[in-house]
């Protein structure tokens, strides 16, 4: 990630399969990667806008042991995303956990936002000759998130959460993209 963020797509060549490296080079040239500075500002802005009411983060997924108060105080005092994470991180609460907690709060993921197990199989790519195996799945399976979203209440909740995260990611790219790109994403078939 560090090599990629420093703007050197060629530096990651030894770490990715040779056959797909042209896709990485193309994505880098098009700005289809995260601008972490923009992502931090966007996340902090979402957290600040959610910082209303008596316990604004009380229902966030993963909140326990008074973390909602710690998160609220950190959001109110921080001017950068790194300051926010520094204020949240302790020996007891590692930075990775606090990063996930802050993102869940920014995206509005409540404890009951998701079912305990994935309600569908979102097919991103595969081999055409393997598609018949999907007929034996007990879960709905499709490349279309719009179709999966219509497969029941649990699927709709999960798809909306997936769309929120994808839209956040699309906004925080070096070359930002419009909302809903995940709904227009094409399946990749290998031959």
Role assignments for model-derived ranges:
Residues 1-191:
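Active-site cores that bind ATP or allylic diphosphates and position pyrophosphate for catalysis
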């Amino acid at each position: 990630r560090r090599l990629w963020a420093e703007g050197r797509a060629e530096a990651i060549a030894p770490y990715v399969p040779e056959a797909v490296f042209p896709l990485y080079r193309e994505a880098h040239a098009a700005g289809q990667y995260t601008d972490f500075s923009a992502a931090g500002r966007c996340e902090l802005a979402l957290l600040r806008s959610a910082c209303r009411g008596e316990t604004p983060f009380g229902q966030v997924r993963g909140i326990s042991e008074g973390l909602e108060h710690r998160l609220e105080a950190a959001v109110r005092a921080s001017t950068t995303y790194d300051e926010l994470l520094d204020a949240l991180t302790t020996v007891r609460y590692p930075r990775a956990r606090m990063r996930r907690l802050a993102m869940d709060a920014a995206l509005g993921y409540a404890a009951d936002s998701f079912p305990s197990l994935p309600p569908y199989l979102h097919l991103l790519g595969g081999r055409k000759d393997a598609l018949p195996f999907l007929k034996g799945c007990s879960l709905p399976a499709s490349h279309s998130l719009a179709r999966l979203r219509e497969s029941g209440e649990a699927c709709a909740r999960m798809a909306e959460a997936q769309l929120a995260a994808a839209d956040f990611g699309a906004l925080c790219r070096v070359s930002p993209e419009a909302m809903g790109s995940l709904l227009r994403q094409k399946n990749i078939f290998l031959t």
